[in-house]
Amino acid sequence: MSLLPVKRRGLLFILSSPSGAGKTTITRALLEREPQLGLSVSVTTRPPRPGEVNGKDYHFISKDEFDQMVENNLLLEHAKVFGNYYGTPLGPVEAALANSQDIIFDIDWQGTQQLKQKLVNDLVTVFILPPSKAELERRLRSRQQDNEDTIRERMRKASDEISHYSEYDYIVVNTDLENSIRTAQSILQAERSKRRRITELPDFVRSLMQD
């Protein structure tokens, strides 16, 4: 939570990783611990997984609806991942930034690149790495969400996704989940205090310097 007595602009906190490295688990933990942090709820054409709630985990829409949003420039970023389409609605993000609300994104490197083209000054990007390839595969299997073909495809894609690590501001190696959560939380808290984000800082400082 920010303790600054002056208004600041919100930030976009990006977590990316190969499937199974822990970004979704870390995202959920940060949302529980950080009251000023909200989730960017993406739209997707993929079907819901067991337990997922429409409007909370994703907005589940048809491919026609997705194409319409792209055509009308209603998406901040969009990408095709494992045969399904994902995108970030523009309106809620713009409103949050203006109201000092921080938004966390659980997106891949393609989406991150698109956001950099539009809102680079508002971004804080973190890439989550697994401690080893063997551990990544173990985590994918332990989720029991995917069949064997999908697991092989995710492992094949992991090397390509990891190759984009250098495009991110911060790296977290998720060896221990709790430590990784705390590291991500520390990054978020430090970034909130950057001078350029505190929009009312000049007026506040002038008031302190007045006789």
Per-range role (PLM):
Residues 1-12, 35:
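Extreme N-terminal, non-catalytic leader segments
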Residues 2-3, 145-146, 160-211:
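NTP-dependent small-molecule kinase module
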Residues 10-14, 102-104:
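Residue-level preference for the first positions of well-ordered beta-strands
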Residues 17, 22:
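Conserved glycine(s) of the Walker
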Residues 23, 111-113, 180-181:
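Short, well-ordered alpha-helical microsegments
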Residues 25-74:
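N-terminal phosphate/diphosphate-binding loop that engages ATP/GTP or pyrophosphate donors
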Residues 64-74, 88-144, 162:
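ATP-dependent NMP and nucleoside kinases share a basic, alpha-helical "lid"
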